[in-house]
Amino acid sequence: MTKLHFDLVSPERLLISADVDQVDVPGSEGDFGVFAGHAPVMTTLRPGVLAIVNGGKAAEKFFVRGGFAEVTLQGLTVLAEEAMPLAELDGPTLDQRIKNAEEDVADAKDAAVRDRAQTTLNQLRELRGALG
């Protein structure tokens, strides 16, 4: 099987650059899989789990919080607003972040601050759901 070159980049670092069989991406219009030879496309991402597939099995999973995905003839590049390997996430720490975000929503003094806090809370809950 022809491999797909894949790069996952966050503002902090390059998380992965590898040749893989497939990448399942949480697109804003729905999840989609990318293989070598995929038609070129550019789309936005929603918060969710990005899975790298090798040998028919999910080899690595990352939580991505928004961003862009670009498929070209050379491969797939994901520029994520935030990305972290699911294997590195700690449940109790995440639960505390959710609790803090809930307090931020409750304490917000104006609509703009509340909306930002609610977006953060929703993303953290999405991440918690991805962890199971």
What spans do the regions from the language model cover?
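Short, charged, intrinsically disordered terminal tails
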Residues: 1-3
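Compact, glycine-rich, soluble single-domain proteins
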Residues: 5-100
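Acidic/glycine-rich phosphate/pyrophosphate-binding loops and surrounding catalytic core
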Residues: 84-132
